[in-house]
Curated annotation (Swiss-Prot):
This is Glycine dehydrogenase (decarboxylating). The glycine cleavage system is composed of four proteins: P, T, L and H. PANTHER family: GLYCINE DEHYDROGENASE (DECARBOXYLATING), GLYCINE DEHYDROGENASE, DECARBOXYLATING. Keywords: Oxidoreductase, Pyridoxal phosphate. It comes from Shewanella pealeana (strain ATCC 700345 / ANG-SQ1). Its cofactor is pyridoxal 5'-phosphate. The modification N6-(pyridoxal phosphate)lysine is found at residue 709. Pfam families: GcvP2_C (PF21478), GDC-P (PF02347). NCBIfam families: gcvP, PRK04366.1. Belongs to the GcvP family. Its EC number is 1.4.4.2.
Length: 962
C-alpha cells in the first residue's frame, strides 16, 4: 500500500497536471535541452530581475475539479432565476439541445480560432455565412457582417459608418429617437464624445428638424410600439442623412423589414435565436447595410471565392478595411467578435427553418395579444396601440403589482414614470400568461386565456397593422429548409465541424493569441440556468451569486495585475483598450488637461492599438524600434519630449510583440510619467506575466486583459472574448458606468462602453474556475511552462530557421518569431506557402507576417505536451527539407508541395497528379505522425483577389444544391 498522506491522495493539484501539457519528466527533458536546471532557473534567465515579483499571488491554493464545481455551484445557487418579462433587448429563449450539445459544448466549435486560415475553416465559415444570410433576409438589406459585440456597440458603429459615408459633410449631429433602449443611447453618447459628434435625443418625428448626418430608431421601440417610419426615412434621405434601425430579430420574422422602409443600416441582438441571456452576454449582434457601403462596414465579412481548382470556397473578405491592416485608418477597432454565438443563432434559424420561426414568432405575438385583451377588458390603459411582444401599461398600482410579481417569481419592467412593461418571449407559456393576469390584475379578474384566444381568432388582431405585416418570403435557401429533423441537423453540424481544425485535433501555435486549453470543467457552469437565464437588469438582490463571482474575480484580477481596481464591462480586448484609453482621457480632462490627446505607439504594436486610440479621439505618433526589436529609447525620449505638453499616453505591449521582455520597460514608464503621460500596457501577452510580474508592478497605469487568451475563455472561432481593464487608483473614478444598473460607485454615472453592465458576464465563470482550480502555484507554473515550451521550440527550430529576436541570455518570452525572408529570397518559397503547407501536416499555421512581414510568430502555450511540440517541430523541419529541394532545383518554384498546398482528397484522386514532380504520399502523408492523425483540408488554396473583386456574402445559389 502507498505511504502517501491523505492530503497527497486528495490530489488538490491534479488539475494543474491536467492543464499543463508536459509532465515533470518532459519538463526536465526540455529544461536540459535549453540549458536550465529548473523552471525557476529558466525564469531568472528570462525575466528581468527588476520586474520579477517576490511574492505569491493572493488567489488561494489550487483545488480539485469536483471541489471547484462544488464551490461554484454554491455561488450559482445564490442567483434567483425569476421569469423575466423585462425585455429591453434581452429575452428568454429555448436553446435547442442539438445545438447546445453539438456546438456550444463541443470543442470542435468552441476552441477554433478566427478563420484567417480559411482552407481549414470551411465549416464555421459556412455557419457564419448562414448568419449573414439570416441577417440580410430578415432586415431586407444587401450586405451583413459576421457579427459585432452587442446591440449598443453595433449602434455606435452605425453612427460612425453614417458619418463616413453621409453626403451631408458639414453636419455633425447624430439623432437618436428617445424610445431607443437606454443602454444603447448610453454607449452612443460615449462614442460620440470621442468623435466630437453632437447627439440629439428626442421624439422620432423631430429628427427632420436638424441638420444631421445620421439617425437611429428602434423597431419595435422601447415601449413596444411598431412604427412605420417610411415617410420619415424618405425625408431624412432628402437631407442626405443615413438612417439606422435597431431591430428585434424575432419580430422581423413577421414584421415588414426595415430595409423595405428605406433604412440604410439595420442592427440588433441575435440573442433570442437560441442564446441564453447570460446576465448580459455574450451575444452576437447583427449589422446589415447597403452594398454601396461595403467598404465602410465594420467587423468581419465572410465572402464566397474560389480555390485553385475553381471550386467554391469561403473566406474573410475585404480585410483591408480592418484594424490589423489599416491600423488607425480602420473602420473600427473590432477584432474578436461573437462568432460562436453567431453560429448558434444561425443554427437556430437552420433548425427551425422559416416555418418554424414563424410559428414561434406568431405564438409570442398571440400570447401578447391575449395579455393585452385581458388588460383592456378590465379597463387598463396601454401606452402602445401596436405591438409584437411588448406591452407598456399605465394606471396600475406599481407597488402592488411589483409586490405580486416578486412574490410570484417574475420580473417586470418598471419605468420611472410608473409605466409597467411586459415583454413576452419564446419561453412564455399559456400558464405563464394566466400567472401574468393574476400579477397585473389581482384576484378575481375573471380573465381566461383560452376564451380570449378564441375571441382573437374570431375577430382578428389589429395589433400589427396590415401594412406592417411581412409579406415577402424569408430564408428560402435550401440550407434553411432541409435540416428540421434532429438527425439531419446533427449530421449537418458534424459535416461542418469535420471541415475545421480546432484544438481538439492539434496545437494552434498562433503568436499573440494564446490558444491554451479550455478545460471542460471550466466550461461546464456556463450552461447552468442559474448563470444563463439571468437578465442583466434584474433586481440586484436576485443576482447575489453573480455579485459574489464578480467580486471574487475582480479581487483576483486586481492582485494578478498589480492594479487597484477592475472594470469587467468591456466585452472584447479591443473594447478594453477603448475603455482604458477613455479612463486616461477623462483623467486628463478632470485635471484641466483636455489638450493632452497624443498617444505614442511603437511601430511593432498590434493594429488594434492605433485603431482604439483613434476611436478614443487621440492622435497617434509612432515610435521606432531598434534592430533588436526593442523600443528605440532615444527615439522614444525625443518624441515624448517633443509632444510633452500634449502627451496623453503610450500604448506598449509587454512582453513586446517581438516576443521578448524588454529590459527598459521601467525606464519607458518613467519617461512617459515625467512628461505627464499615462502608460497603457496592452495585456495581449499577459500569459508571460501571471505570477512572475504584473503591469502595476512594472509601473503601468492601465491594462486590458484578454480573458479569451490568458484566462481560458475559448476563442470560439472568432469570439466571444472579454477585455476587462485594471487601473491604478487615480484612474478608478473614470471606469465605465451604466445608465440602467447602478452600484453605488464613483464611476456609476460615467458613460458605458458595452450594452450590459458586466459585458459578457455569462462566460466569466470560465475564468473564475480557471483561477480557482490552478491557484497561486498553478498560475505561476503555467506561465513558467509557457516560457519553457516557447524556448524549447525556438532552440529546436533555430538550427533550421533564423530566429528574428531574442532577449537576455538569448531567450524569448512565451513566443518566438522565425524569419522566413532569407529563405524566400533564396528559394522563392513564401511565408504563405509554409503556412498552407502546415495544413497538410495537420497544423494551423502560426501568426503570419506579424509583427514583421515575412515571418511566423509561434506561441505554443503551457497546455501543449512535449509530444505535440515535437510533432510540430518535426513538421517544420520537414518543411525546411522541402524548401531545400526547391533551392536545389529538384522541385520547380511553381510546382512543389509548398506552392500547391494545401492538398485535398480531390488532388490525389486526380490522374493529372502524376505530372507533378512529387508523389501523392509526399503531398498528404509527409511524416508518419500525419499518417496516424490525418486532417484533410476540404478546399485548395483560396484566391483572395477573386473573392474581393467578385464580392458575394450570401449562401450559394440554389443551383449548387440541385
Amino acid at each position: 500500500m502507498t505511504t502517501e498522506t491523505l492530503t497527497q491522495l486528495e490530489q488538490h493539484e491534479l488539475f494543474l497536471r491536467r492543464h499543463i501539457g508536459p509532465g515533470a519528466d518532459q519538463q526536465q527533458e526540455m529544461l536540459n535541452f535549453v540549458g536550465a536546471e529548473s523552471l525557476e532557473d529558466l525564469t531568472a534567465q528570462i525575466v528581468p530581475g527588476a520586474i520579477l515579483l517576490n511574492r505569491d499571488l493572493a488567489v488561494g491554493d489550487s483545488c480539485g475539479e469536483a471541489e471547484g464545481l462544488a464551490y461554484i455551484r454554491k455561488i450559482a445557487d445564490k442567483n434567483k432565476v425569476f421569469k423575466s418579462y423585462i425585455g429591453m433587448g434581452y429575452h428568454g429563449t429555448e436553446v435547442p439541445s442539438v445545438i447546445q450539445r453539438n456546438v456550444l459544448e463541443n470543442p470542435g466549435w468552441y476552441t477554433a480560432y478566427t478563420p484567417y486560415q480559411p482552407e481549414i475553416a470551411q465549416g464555421r465559415l459556412e455557419a457564419i455565412l448562414n448568419f449573414q444570410q439570416v441577417s440580410m433576409d430578415l432586415t431586407g438589406l444587401d450586405l451583413a457582417s459576421s457579427s459585432l459585440l452587442d446591440e449598443a456597440t453595433a449602434a455606435a458603429e452605425a453612427m460612425a459608418l453614417s458619418k463616413r459615408v453621409s453626403k451631408a459633410k458639414k453636419a455633425n449631429i447624430f439623432f437618436v429617437a428617445d424610445d431607443v433602449f437606454p443602454q444603447t443611447i448610453d454607449v452612443i453618447k460615449t462614442r460620440a464624445e470621442c468623435f466630437g459628434f453632437e447627439v440629439v435625443v428626442g421624439p422620432a418625428e423631430e429628427a427632420v428638424n436638424y441638420e444631421l448626418f445620421g439617425a437611429l430608431f428602434q423597431y419595435t421601440n422601447r415601449v413596444g410600439q411598431i412604427c412605420d417610419h417610411t415617410e420619415l426615412f424618405a425625408k431624412l434621405h432628402e437631407k442626405k442623412a443615413l438612417v439606422s434601425v435597431a431591430a428585434d430579430i424575432m419580430s422581423l420574422v413577421v414584421l415588414k423589414s426595415p430595409g423595405s422602409m428605406g433604412a440604410d443600416v439595420v442592427l440588433g441582438n441575435s440573442q433570442r435565436f437560441g442564446v441564453p441571456m447570460g446576465f448580459g452576454g455574450p451575444h452576437a449582434a447583427f449589422f446589415v447595410t447597403r452594398d454601396e457601403y461595403k467598404r465602410s462596414l465594420p467587423g468581419r465579412i465572410i465572402g464566397v471565392s474560389q480555390d485553385t481548382r475553381g471550386n467554391r470556397a469561403l473566406r474573410m473578405a475585404m480585410q483591408t478595411r480592418e484594424q490589423h491592416i489599416r491600423r488607425e485608418k480602420a473602420n473600427s477597432n473590432i477584432c474578436t467578435a461573437q462568432v460562436l454565438l453567431a453560429n448558434m443563432a444561425s443554427f437556430y434559424a437552420v433548425f427551425h427553418g422559416p416555418q418554424g420561426l414563424k410559428v414561434i414568432a406568431e405564438r409570442i405575438h398571440r400570447l401578447t395579444d391575449i395579455v393585452a385583451a385581458a388588460l383592456t377588458a378590465k379597463g387598463v390603459e396601454l401606452v402602445n396601440n401596436t405591438w409584437f411582444d411588448t406591452l407598456s401599461i399605465k394606471g396600475l398600482d406599481v407597488t402592488a403589482v411589483q409586490a405580486r410579481a416578486l412574490a410570484t417569481g417574475l420580473n417586470l419592467r418598471i419605468d420611472s414614470d410608473g409605466v409597467i412593461g411586459v415583454s413576452l418571449s419564446e419561453t412564455t407559456t399559456r400558464s405563464d400568461v394566466a400567472e401574468l393576469f393574476d400579477v397585473l390584475l389581482g384576484e378575481g379578474h375573471g380573465q381566461d386565456a383560452a376564451a380570449l384566444d378564441a375571441a382573437i381568432i374570431a375577430n382578428g388582431s389589429s395589433s400589427i397593422p396590415s401594412e406592417l405585416v411581412r409579406k415577402d418570403a424569408i430564408l428560402t435557401h435550401p440550407t434553411f429548409n432541409r435540416y428540421q429533423s434532429e438527425t439531419e441537423m446533427m449530421r449537418y453540424i458534424k459535416r461542418l465541424e469535420n471541415k475545421d481544425l480546432a484544438l481538439n485535433h492539434s496545437m494552434i501555435s498562433l503568436g499573440s493569441c494564446t490558444m491554451k486549453l479550455n478545460a471542460a470543467t471550466e466550461m461546464a457552469p456556463i450552461t447552468w440556468p442559474e448563470f444563463g437565464n439571468m437578465h442583466p437588469f434584474c433586481p440586484q438582490d436576485q443576482a447575489q451569486g453573480y455579485a459574489q463571482l464578480l467580486e471574487e474575480l475582480s479581487t483576483w484580477l486586481v492582485d494578478i495585475t498589480g492594479y487597484d481596481a477592475v472594470s469587467l464591462q468591456p466585452n472584447s480586448g479591443a473594447q478594453g483598450e477603448y475603455a482604458g484609453l477613455l479612463a486616461i482621457k477623462q483623467y486628463h480632462e478632470s485635471r484641466g488637461d483636455a489638450h493632452r490627446n497624443i498617444c505614442l505607439i511603437p511601430q511593432s504594436a498590434h493594429g488594434t492599438n492605433p485603431a482604439s486610440a483613434q476611436l478614443a479621439g487621440m492622435k497617434i505618433v509612432v515610435t521606432a524600434c531598434d534592430k533588436a526589436g526593442n523600443i528605440d529609447m532615444a527615439d522614444l525620449k525625443a518624441k515624448a519630449a517633443e509632444v510633452a505638453d500634449n502627451l496623453s499616453c503610450i500604448m506598449v505591449t509587454y512582453p513586446s510583440t517581438h516576443g521578448v521582455y524588454e529590459e527598459t520597460i521601467g525606464e519607458i514608464c518613467e519617461v512617459i510619467h515625467q512628461h505627464g503621460g499615462q502608460v497603457y500596457l496592452d495585456g495581449a501577452n499577459m500569459n508571460a506575466q501571471v505570477g512572475l510580474t504584473s503591469p502595476g508592478f512594472i509601473g503601468a497605469d492601465v491594462s486590458h486583459l484578454n480573458l479569451h487568451k490568458t484566462f481560458a475563455i475559448p476563442h470560439g472561432g472568432g469570439g466571444p472574448g472579454m477585455g476587462p481593464i485594471g487601473v491604478k487608483k487615480h484612474l478608478a473614478p473614470f471606469l465605465s458606468g451604466h445608465s440602467v444598473v447602478k452600484h453605488g460607485l464613483e464611476s456609476d454615472n460615467n458613460g458605458a462602453v458595452s450594452a450590459a453592465p458586466f459585458g459578457s458576464a455569462g462566460i466569466l465563470p470560465i475564468t473564475w474556475m480557471y483561477i480557482k482550480l490552478l491557484g497561486k502555484k498553478g498560475l505561476r507554473q503555467s506561465t513558467q511552462v509557457a516560457l519553457l515550451n516557447a524556448n524549447y521550440v525556438m532552440k529546436k527550430l533555430s538550427a533550421h530557421y533564423p530566429v528574428l529576436y531574442t532577449g537576455r541570455n538569448d531567450r524569448v518570452a512565451h513566443e518566438c518569431i522565425i524569419d522566413l525572408r532569407p529563405l524566400k529570397e533564396a528559394s522563392g518559397v513564401t511565408e504563405m506557402d509554409i503556412a498552407k503547407r502546415l495544413n497538410d501536416y495537420g497544423f494551423h499555421a502560426p501568426t503570419m507576417s506579424f509583427p514583421v512581414a515575412g515571418t511566423l510568430m509561434i506561441e505554443p502555450t503551457e497546455s501543449e505536451s512535449k509530444v505535440e511540440l515535437d510533432r510540430f517541430i518535426e513538421a517544420m523541419v520537414s518543411i525546411r527539407g522541402e524548401i531545400a529541394k526547391v533551392e536545389a532545383g529538384e522541385w520547380p518554384v511553381d510546382n512543389n508541395p509548398l506552392h500547391n498546398a494545401p492538398h485535398t482528397l480531390a488532388d490525389i484522386m486526380d490522374p493529372a497528379f502524376d505530372s507533378r514532380p512529387y508523389s501523392r504520399e509526399e503531398a498528404v502523408f509527409p511524416t508518419n505522425a500525419v499518417k496516424a492523425n490525418k486532417f484533410w483540408p476540404t478546399v485548395n488554396r483560396i484566391d483572395d483577389v477573386y473573392g474581393d473583386r467578385n464580392l458575394m456574402c450570401s449562401c450559394a445559389p440554389v443551383s449548387d444544391y440541385e
